[in-house]
Amino acid sequence: MMQELQRWIEDEETKRGYIRTKTPLMAKSDLYKISGHWDHYKDGMFVLGDEETDKEVFALRPMTCPFQYYVYKAEQHSYRDLPLRYGETSTLFRNEDSGEMHGLTRVRQFTISEGHLIVRPDQMVKEFKDCIALAQYCLQVLGVEEDVTYHLSKWDPNNREKYIGDAEVWNQTEAHIRQMLEELNIPFTEDVGEAAFYGPKVDINAKNVYGKEDTMIT
């Protein structure tokens, strides 16, 4: 079943212009320090080595974003090359506390489909809407599109140390996402403090058998 799902989503992403990547399962701590994960997500990572005693420290990847952005950085690009869409079926590792583990929705190793887009400002609206369309297509094919809720996950300005970037950029980005969701006529709630440390996001959630919402797509 996993192989069929992987083949299906990869074929669909390729049709939509995604470039397939295959990135390592771990990296030196240097990469995570550049991306901000070392300062803001280290407790959720499996770290290999000790910074005080070892010359090199590695960590298993908790997400693919630093790796795919490094793929982009490895070559020189013109603005004419954009948008660039990277897709990967990624096996990830997160050092979840035992009390946070839950069924197959909160585990320490899992495989998901990840995509990262490099776009010009004038391309942002179209690319965002195309991402939502891809998510909705997947939900429709899997037969769960009627059971989901949409959430604009925002930063908490009263907890600034949790995030990177300045307030103006955060507020502008949240306003752009809000406007695009409204243009798509998608009902959504706004959840303060649920953003990633690096930016706001749209979470697509579904209720499990216990009535608790789990995030299916971000």
Spans of features found by a protein language model:
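TRNA-recognition modules of translation machinery and tRNA-sensing kinases, especially anticodon-binding
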Residues: M1-T218
